[in-house]
Regions:
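Acidic/polar-rich alpha-helix caps and helix-coil junctions
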Residues: 1-137
């Protein structure tokens, strides 16, 4: 969908209107007159603290079959950062925190959502041994 003068050089939006701004510095600028982009140098995180928290919760679940108090605390830190209710509060409306395979799926979803656009999904699917089904959808 083009909403400018028809010149592709002046196009400033994506096909669907959504644009991922994860890892884009708010100080980066684009000058349309000179067609110059000014990038701000910054350190790209190889691993975020949220990934460590999610990995801990997942490992704790795989080891014990349930979530410990520490795991719930770490999940809540990740959710609190983006303004979501706590894990227990979210699942209280559905009858409480699930267990077993359903909890595993929920932890996978939490990880997929938090780490979206970071290049982790394929390796997670291989680690979870679901790549052969997920990639064939």
């Amino acid at each position: 969908m083009q909403q400018n003068n028809g010149n592709a050089k002046d196009e400033y939006q994506t096909d669907n209107g959504y644009y991922c701004q994860k890892w884009v510095s708010k100080y980066d600028t684009y000058n349309r007159t000179t067609d110059q982009i000014t990038y701000n140098r910054w350190c790209f995180p190889y691993m975020r603290l949220a990934e460590l928290y999610l990995s801990y919760a997942e490992a704790d679940f795989e080891y014990s079959g349930t979530l410990s108090t520490a795991s719930l605390s770490y999940l809540n830190k990740v959710r609190e950062r983006c303004g979501l209710p706590t894990f227990a509060d979210s699942w209280a409306k559905a009858g409480g925190i699930p267990s077993g395979e359903k909890l595993r799926e929920i932890l996978h979803d939490e990880r997929s959502i938090e780490l979206a656009m970071e290049g982790r999904r394929f390796h997670d699917m291989r680690r979870w041994k679901i790549a052969h089904t997920e990639m064939m959808r």
